């Protein structure tokens, strides 16, 4: 498991006083109101204190206390902001962070290894796990539904699924 979780990617500056535009990598954008600070993923010793934030067109605009000019903000462009796992919001039962799902080995209920999760698609109704198939040439798209996903073991690094008709075609 990762010690740090990505909460956003800084994509641009905003204005002249050091604000930045952030694409949120969290389901709950209001989560930023609970965060006192974030860290830069590529330099964990850099702590950025959130002075204020607002949401505009699905982009979070953040003013960090330590950044006061557009030139300083420009240096943050294309960098990820993270928080320590222990500061993350507690997830409900049978809910997982995407970073913990990616990389899991996928088995059917008979123990046959089907592949490895390489990405997660966010859809309107449920997530879809993209599995790099070991048994064929194309990816396996696994709906994240209780009827399909029967067991997830993050610590052991696997997921067991019920193979329904058409899933492996």
From Swiss-Prot:
BP GO terms, sorted: ribosomal small subunit biogenesis; rRNA processing
Protein name: Ribosome maturation factor RimM
GO MF assignments: ribosome binding
Function field: An accessory protein needed during the final step in the assembly of 30S ribosomal subunit, possibly for assembly of the head region. Essential for efficient processing of 16S rRNA. May be needed both before and after RbfA during the maturation of 16S rRNA. It has affinity for free ribosomal 30S subunits but not for 70S ribosomes.
Native source species: Caldicellulosiruptor bescii (strain ATCC BAA-1888 / DSM 6725 / KCTC 15123 / Z-1320)
InterPro entries: PRC-brl_dom, PRC_barrel-like_sf, RimM, RimM_N, RimM_N_sf, Transl_B-barrel_sf
Residues of the PRC barrel domain: 92-167
Cellular component annotations (GO), alphabetically ordered: cytoplasm; ribosome
Oligomer status and interactors: Binds ribosomal protein uS19.
Entry superkingdom: Bacteria
Domain observations: The PRC barrel domain binds ribosomal protein uS19.
């Amino acid at each position: 498991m990762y010690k740090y979780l990505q909460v956003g990617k800084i994509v641009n500056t905003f204005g002249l006083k050091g604000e930045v535009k952030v694409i949120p990598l969290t389901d709950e954008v209001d989560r930023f109101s609970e965060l006192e600070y974030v860290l830069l993923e590529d330099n964990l010793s850099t702590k950025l204190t959130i002075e204020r934030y607002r949401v505009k067109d699905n982009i979070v605009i953040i003013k960090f206390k330590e950044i006061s000019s557009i030139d300083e903000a420009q240096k943050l462009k294309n960098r990820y902001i993270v928080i320590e796992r222990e500061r993350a919001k507690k997830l409900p039962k049978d809910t997982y962070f995407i970073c913990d799902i990616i990389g899991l080995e996928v088995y059917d209920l008979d123990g046959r290894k089907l592949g490895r999760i390489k990405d997660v698609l966010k859809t309107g109704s449920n997530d879809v796990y993209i599995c790099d198939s070991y048994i064929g040439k194309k990816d396996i798209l696994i709906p994240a539904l209780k009827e399909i996903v029967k067991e997830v073991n993050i610590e052991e690094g696997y997921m067991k699924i019920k193979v329904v008709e058409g899933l492996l075609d």
